[in-house]
From Swiss-Prot:
A molecular function (GO) term: GTP binding
Positions annotated to bind GTP: 272-277, 389, 420, 515-518
Record's GO cellular component terms: cytosol
Organism: Mycolicibacterium paratuberculosis (strain ATCC BAA-968 / K-10)
Involved pathway(s): Carbohydrate biosynthesis; gluconeogenesis
Reaction catalyzed: oxaloacetate + GTP = phosphoenolpyruvate + GDP + CO2
Function as written in the Swiss-Prot or TrEMBL entry: Catalyzes the conversion of oxaloacetate (OAA) to phosphoenolpyruvate (PEP), the rate-limiting step in the metabolic pathway that produces glucose from lactate and other precursors derived from the citric acid cycle.
Gene name tied to this protein: pckG
Signal peptide stretch: none
Name of this protein: Phosphoenolpyruvate carboxykinase [GTP]
Enzyme class: lyase
InterPro entries, per the entry: PEP_carboxykin_GTP_CS, PEP_carboxykinase_C, PEP_carboxykinase_GTP, PEP_carboxykinase_GTP_C, PEP_carboxykinase_GTP_N, PEP_carboxykinase_N
Amino acid sequence: MTSATIPGLDTAPTNHQGLLSWVQEVAELTQPDRVVFADGSDEEFNRLAAELVEAGTLKKLNEKKHPNSYLALSDPSDVARVESRTYICTEEESGAGPTNNWMDPTEMRSIMTDLYRGCMRGRTMWVVPFCMGPLGVEDPKLGVEITDSEYVVISMKVMTRMGKAALEKMGDDGFFVKALHSVGAPLEPGQKDVPWPCNDTKYITHFPETREIWSYGSGYGGNALLGKKCYSLRIASAMAHDEGWLAEHMLILKLISPENKAYYFAAAFPSACGKTNLAMLQPTIPGWRAETLGDDIAWMRFGKDGRLYAVNPEFGFFGVAPGTNWKSNPNAMRTIEAGNTVFTNVALTDDNDVWWEGLEGQPEHLIDWKGNDWYAGKTETPAAHPNSRYCTPMSQCPILAPEWDDPQGVPISGILFGARRKTTVPLVTQARDWQHGVFMGATMGSEQTAAAEGKVGTVRRDPMAMLPFLGYHVGDYFQHWIDLGKNSDESKLPKVFFVNWFRRGDDGGFLWPGFGENSRVLKWIVDRIEHKAGGQDTPIGIVPKAEDLDLDGLDVSVDDVAKALAVNPDEWREELPQIEEWFEFVGEKLPTGVRDEFEALKQRLSEAG
């Protein structure tokens, strides 16, 4: 088929010639049955959802329990981000750095063009315009995803500001990131479709220099919703490096003191370290309140007043379901209960409700994420996939901060780095200054989770929780952080802290209860920012004593809190060779400033006896 004979190409609702010529070029390559520009309307969402129910991709859930909500079960081979098939294709291999897979851009384009040839046959090609962040900003970060997946279209409506308004924002010549996606499953005439089309061959490719994303073979979240990690972190981190800002894997939290003073925090945690739970915190200490602005991504720029301001580029939550419950995260549960949610790979109850491991009230019988019968106490495999998800609108969150859609963003008082560590790392540590904070973030290590491929439980370095999401060389990224600090007024920079909710005692149990009780740690952090709280200088930074924390009403022994806060120089000396090994991996682009902090740490540990 030529472009002249592909229905929909001649009725595009835009005069943007750059967009139109790209859409035509992709249509001629991929050969869809028709082209449709998504408008982002509720009517479109409902129509597509109904079609996906008819096709067997979605199941409509119990309207009383989850209004306008659906469950999708993926192909068992397509359940998570595929880091082994994720590429950063810079002109020079050194541009991608040692943390990324690299291929020559010309070679990659050739391979993927062959894969794309005819790949949308028998399908509809959707043109999905979207905006990352509030539509009202001076310099909106726009994108267009071309996809052959209706699941992607409805998910993009939840996760981004998608459709007509974003297309209008582009005008006739506005810049946009080109994001091309196909499940790689063409249909021959008369061929029956499968509920979850995908391909064994997968590529999730980024071209940072030309701001393009090409994805093939996967229908799953992070590989297919290209506004998510692909744009808002991998491409945006390269943009941020070039333009002098930060695109980070961070939640944004607003904490309000009993005096009604607001503090805003950005916090970076690797997957499954409690990021969403902290973003939707319910403080347990009287008089303190929390509101959320985002649970996954923060874009931060310096304002005219010299402070660092953050916006959340996303429009929805794409959270891990297992472990989410009325105790760990009641606000996530309330957000989901409000409806308009697409669940993926959770279990289905007999009354068309959803269930996952960790959720209260385990039923006797379920249909598991593979579509099989599951019986409590008898079936040995999990009912929900460990990386199963809910995709739900942010606007439904009961503790959403009113500033969530403010183009100016919010001024950040503190940056938190965190990780999942059983030993060594205290409950909370304050960095001595910005550069020391960069060192803390650069050397983060966390135990592996189910959100990515790899062995669960092993510790891997995950700098600023950005290891899988950097769009350029990790050493240049560290230098970018240091430079932003050097070029700023230090008195206006956010204070930097490191937290670890997951330290364990000798009996293997958690020393700190976590969840809402983490507000006690945040209170100490606020008091440090206000120069009100005590803390002891240790070789690794400033750490509170147990009595420096507000422990009123906490059902944990002071002894356990002290153990959670302990700094053991011997354990930290064991950490040093691992950090050295990580720095060798980063290579010659490791900034001098980060190396200096490491040498200073070694010196302080040697003096600690």
